[in-house]
Amino acid sequence: MKVVIVGGVAGGASAAARIRRLDESAEIIVFEKTGYISYANCGLPYYIGDVITDSGDLTLQTPESFWKRFRISVKVNHEVTNIDVTQKTVKVKNLLTGTEWEETYDKLLLSPGAKPVRPNLPGIDSEKIFSLRTVEDTFRIHDYLEKTKAQNAVVVGGGYIGIEVAENLKEKGLNVTIVQRPNQLMNTLDYDMASFVHSKLRAKGITLRLNSNVTSFRQDGECIVTLLEDNSEIAADMVLLAIGVAPENSLAKQAGLKLGVKGSIVVNDRMETSVQDIYAVGDAIQVKHFVTEEDTVIALAGPANKQGRIAADNICGGDSHYQGSMGSSIIKIFDMTVAGTGLTEKVAKSMGIDCESVVLSPASHAGYYPGAKVMTMKVVFEKDTWKLLGAQIVGTEGVDKRLDVLATAMHAGMKANMLKDLDLAYAPPFSSAKDPVNMAGFMIENIRNGFVKQYHWDEIAGLPRDGSVTLLDTRTAYEYKSGHIDGYINIPVDDLRERMNEIDDSKPVYVICQSGLRSYIACRILTQNGFDCYNFSGGYRFYASVIKEKEMSEYTYPCGMEK
């Protein structure tokens, strides 16, 4: 059997190695149009920022190492330009010599990846405007920075790549501005959770231009000027485009393969395309969203590696099936960690799903053990079925662990309230006896059992201030004086039983505290005394971050007690 693979990196390279492990006699040829067969594309921004200092560390495999270990023929700087599906041949061009020839195949695997979105804007062809997708792109940006000693940079786009590049340029000493068309960075987060990202970046000195649309670029002496829709201008030494990526489908389109969402290559769960003996994996393909089962495109390295393995199994006569992607992802933003999986609340509601969410601010480990830090978790679930829909976490330590547990629970089909039953590892340096994931489950179970009703940050402005409801802040007097929401009266939770006569039991009571715990306790006290209570999801800390985009303290206090 002769297998030709178009494209290396995650999907193609993992498939090639798997095929060899399954079939020692197969002839395997990999064509890669860049100069690198398998590289750490997720690490490219960190080479720009000199976090990774050795360019060789970006290379995971070389043509020589692939041949020596796997006897796989890898040809870099070779582009496949045409597929003849009838004759089962591909046309190959050596990009260094210009030589072209045809190569036959029994099985063909496409792993072309994605290409950076580069809108047709005036001035976009300037040599001072860069995209980051390949190792060669990385070297060009790095060399430009070293050569020009650039001081100011504009990053267009506020997704993962844009933020990582902005961070690394800032760490390198540049003044950085991020321009983003929507009103928030990171569309994998809800606006409320993205507010923590905004606060962190601003605290680190990065300028954010949200709700800003780029209309053109202009060369002005040694500067490149970015022009925005509101007629403002930003002068800089360089511009990095990180607007997003689109499936690289030119070869698939030429071959007549069926295309789907955003021009992606349609495959079944065996990674087979619409043409027999042609498979496809990675950022170029259409996948099923694991939560919604709808067709989508999810360009991440983890899914690409799994897809490569599944395609290899089936090429070699197996019967492996891809179960879909949830989009589990994580990013470091200076000393902050941000992670998410599944659907955001905004996306779920836009799809007509009747959903609810809980927001909590647990500690990374036991509060009495030194170094515990607060994380903010948001868990989204369907109201009627209690199905887990998604989760988002912002914090420092322990974020990755909790996100992975939540993603695993979603994959296993657990209901949201069942999170309380998970038996998770505990010792004071690592967690609490009630792990944050368990705590989310407890909160959801309380809602399910009718023990508490919630209200959210975007409802506060609409609450009446005419005396028809009671707005109650149950924090300490010190906390209340340090900052509170207009219209809220202060009765600390520990004084509530003695001062309950100050609250009119004929009016609904909307309760808030710092994180949501004391206000929940207050709601239970009041509810059992005949009051109609609503607990604020997330607490004042969360509200202040969302409304004021204020960077809140990352430290917690012993035993979960708040100052």
Predicted regions, residues:
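Mid-to-C-terminal Rossmann-like scaffold of FAD/NAD(P)H-dependent oxidoreductases
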Residues: 1, 8, 284-397, 428-432, ...
